[in-house]
Amino acid sequence: MGSSGLARLQGLFAVYKPPGLKWLHVRETVELQLLKGLNAQQPSAPEQHVRFLLGPVEGSEEKKLTLTATSVPSLTTHRLVRGPAFRNLKIGVGHRLDVQASGVLVLAVGHGRSLLTDMYDAHLTKDYTVRGLLGKATDNFCEDGQLIEKTTYDHVTRERLDRILAMIQGSHQKALVMYSNLDLKSQEAYERAVQGVIRPMNKSPMLIAGIRCLHFAPPEFLLEVQCMHETQQQLRRLVHEIGLELKTTAVCMQVRRTRDGFFGLDDALLRTQWDLHSIQDAIQTAAPRVARELRKNLSLMSGHQQQLPSAGQPWASRVQAPL
């Protein structure tokens, strides 16, 4: 088996990280399951060696012995002698998720680890759903943190929240243009903004390409955030800052990544699917799309292409679905 099974493990795939698990634990679990699957495969036929074995002479009534050339299997490659054929795999991790966060986590095996670098260089956006709770503030911006303050929120309306979100998106879009090294007054900056293809040229602070409210039922609200160069803790702090702008307080109840670049929830393998065959199939299915999208996005960063595929466009350039 060996080489053929390993050959189908070269590339990128996505898993769904549950909340409460460290990304390192996810990687180690996936590696363990892959090694178990690889080592359970039927081994290839052992090599045959010629040995001269002592035996009776055929057709002779006398008890004479002679040496006979015989082909016997070599035991040097037997798994009971050599041990497991695969002892470790090098698995790379894409944009990480902290312990409390859940959602799409991109992993790489073999040459796929170099594709992770290409993903970083393309500065692709990521989508999150962020659940907030009005009326309280904590030391870590999370619902389970140490309570600092309680406030009223009866004055908060959906319209007021939408205005705050529009202000946040507008300020971040200006920052996005600045970090893209485009002239704010140029036609190129305008056209790229309309097409949703503006990307920072280098590392930058968290940039929000789009933010909107999906659900508002005080004290709870649900946001969808499209961003890049973020951490999950920065998204929790964003909820806190939105609360302050609303003249109240707010904490974050949940951070869930629904898309990382061109990997969405539909691509993410659940924990019950972290096995050799499911991961091999996921890598093979994603490979053409990965190559195509990376080529488009890296060409865009080089200035050779003016349109980004729909997976990374801000919502302003998509058809809005009814909420």
Swiss-Prot record:
Q: Which residues form a coiled coil?
A: none
GO terms for molecular function, please? Answer: pseudouridine synthase activity; RNA binding; tRNA pseudouridine(55) synthase activity
Q: What class of enzyme is it?
A: isomerase
Q: Which UniProt keywords apply?
A: Isomerase, Mitochondrion, mRNA processing, Transit peptide, tRNA processing
Location(s) in or outside the cell: Mitochondrion matrix
| Catalytic activity entry | a uridine in mRNA = a pseudouridine in mRNA; uridine(55) in tRNA = pseudouridine(55) in tRNA
Listed under GO biological process in this entry are: mRNA processing; mRNA pseudouridine synthesis; positive regulation of mitochondrial translation; tRNA processing
Q: Which family does it belong to?
A: Belongs to the pseudouridine synthase TruB family.
**Function description:** Minor enzyme contributing to the isomerization of uridine to pseudouridine (pseudouridylation) of specific mitochondrial mRNAs (mt-mRNAs) such as COXI and COXIII mt-mRNAs. As a component of a functional protein-RNA module, consisting of RCC1L, NGRN, RPUSD3, RPUSD4, TRUB2, FASTKD2 and 16S mitochondrial ribosomal RNA (16S mt-rRNA), controls 16S mt-rRNA abundance and is required for intra-mitochondrial translation. Also catalyzes pseudouridylation of some tRNAs, including synthesis of pseudouridine(55) from uracil-55, in the psi GC loop of a subset of tRNAs.
Task: Summarize subunit and interaction data from the UniProt record for this chain.
Answer: Forms a regulatory protein-RNA complex, consisting of RCC1L, NGRN, RPUSD3, RPUSD4, TRUB2, FASTKD2 and 16S mt-rRNA.
Q: What is this protein called?
A: Pseudouridylate synthase TRUB2, mitochondrial
What organism is this sequence from?
A: Rattus norvegicus (Rat)
